[in-house]
Amino acid sequence: MASRPECGHERNMATIRQAEAHQGEGGIGLSLHGNRLRVIETGPGLRQTLVELIDGAQASLKLYYYIFAGDGSGRLILDRLVAARARGVAVTLMIDAFGSADTPVHFFDPLVAAGGHFGRFGARRSTRYLIRNHQKLAIADDRRLLMGGFNVEDDYFGVPPEDCWHDLGLLVEGPQVQAMTSWYGQLWRWVSTRGQRFRTLRRMVRNWRQPHHDADGPMRWVIGGPTRRLSPWAQMVKHDLERAGRLDMVAAYFSPGRGMLKRIATAARRQGARLILPSRSDNGATVAAARLLYGPLLKRGVEIFEYQSCKLHMKLIVVDDAVYIGSANFDMRSLFLNLEIMLRVEDAGFASAMRGFIDRRAKESRQVTLETHRAQRSLPTLVKQWISYFLVGFLDYTVTRRLNFRNPDAD
């Protein structure tokens, strides 16, 4: 483990017009309670924004990525972090040991040699290794933050364009970043502890409260992680869905349980529900598992589209006037097990703009109807879908929970 870090209003509601006015300047944007938010819609834009965030840092950089690859993009970002250290910026980088398993630890030696701090989540080889930290964020000077579903790897930055991941990022500037700085500090202390005790991690997730949070404010950070019930971020989505009039969702991995499926169907009966899901992925079982669920949803009026342009890695939920952007998928792992970060923004103008964004993704997708779904559902296809759902939606989830929750005091 590398060295530990040193210890050390007026509401401006966005309107649809304000959000659209930022489209030509690199994405949808708004100002809210002294915070500026900007949506980054393209892979090259994500990489450019991350580089600019690092190069613009004056005092500190704090990064966590599930995957940090040793490819061209990984070397570029690592080089920028080393350059930041050379100009006196304190740099801390954490990665997930499972997600970044293909990247040798010595790849990060230049950062440690430059005086940066480096740690791996889940480095201890035990059943705890099955618990993954799926969060992705970069914080500069505790005032600017870039988050979303993307990792540090060529595929997420549009390289190559014909087979990349289509993802989303959100740049946040303002006082709301302090909450994630606080969470990052807790996470670094846990990663820096030799034992990386599971009980401590569960307590962190269960007890985390956003510092200085205004319960009536429009912005709220929600954390996900391994608890005995639905993950905290998913509990909030559940609460919104139970009262939802309209639901629009873009999900890279979709295999929720029956309760969530019923809530989606209920929204469809009210004002409508639309899902944009992948037509292809790095793991074909995840696509097949999602397709097993299409029939019951289509029968209940849910609109389903499969994205065609490239692989889909986006995590975006719009429930009435609330928008969720972050790292969490809508599968059993993200709903119950993985550490996740989502930002919930409640603003009618922002929600409308993000629905417009989803409209554009729908135009790049193929709509699945009940007729086309039934026409493609042969017996071999159905067997494949059931096996895939068993593996993705049941076995992985069940085994991980039983190994790690068999004794809440065990480590």
Regions found by a protein language model. Give the residues of each.
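Charged, low-complexity intrinsically disordered terminal segments
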Residues: 2, 6-411
